[in-house]
From Swiss-Prot:
One of its GO terms (biological process) is response to wounding. The keyword Membrane does not apply. Pfam families: SIKE. Keywords: Coiled coil, Cytoplasm, Phosphoprotein. This is FGFR1 oncogene partner 2 homolog. It comes from Rattus norvegicus (Rat). It is found in: Cytoplasm. The modification Phosphoserine is found at S140. Induction: By wound, in oral mucosa undergoing tooth extraction. May be involved in wound healing pathway underlying the favorable early wound closure characteristics of oral mucosa. Accelerates the collagen gel contraction in vitro.
Amino acid sequence: MSCTIEKALADAKALVERLRDHDDAAESLIEQTTALSKRVEAMKQYQEEIQELNEVARHRPRSTLVMGIQQENRQIRELQQENKELRTSLEEHQSALELIMSKYREQMFRLLMASKKDDPGIIMKLKEQHSKIDMVHRNSCEGFFLDASRHILEAPQHGLERRHLEANQNELQAHVDQITEMAAVMRKAIEIDEQQGCKEQERIFQLEQENKGLREILQITRESFLNLRKDDASESTSLSALVTNSDLSLRKS
């Protein structure tokens, strides 16, 4: 009796597992059927749109079609020209950013050399600032220009690709705006660093002038002291001569 119950339970368990497998297979079939139905629906819609376009094209005269094609070709040429201008603008922005970064590195090096004997905290702060800005510049420039070069396409041959190119150009223009904004930030940072460098140079010049004045005062004091010593020596010599002369006169008398 117990064997039959265990066998029945095992059979029931096997049936449950088979039912689960069948359910999984049914769900996958349902998903595939849904995807196929969506694809068929999209193909039907595409076919209907093509038929509508063909009907419209049949009713339109050829001159209108030729004019439309010419206008589209003109727009394509304009988009090609815009692509060239955007590419040139990207190259100019890249060269400008490289120049800005080289000037910034040179200014930072000067500040580090000028502040080397003043405060080690300033040196660490300047190094951290330089590394952060350099990393931001490298990552942003590489990402922006790689995306820009990837999205510059050749001229399209029909309306859908032309809209795709316009979207790419909008994205490219956004990248150019971001690069321009970053260049403005870099210019502002360089101006601040130049102001700090001018302050440091003014301080160094002031200290040099003070040092020069102190050296002149010291030289004048030293010369005065030497002159006083010479005067004292001459006075002592004259006094000794007078004493000698008076002694001789007394002896003669």
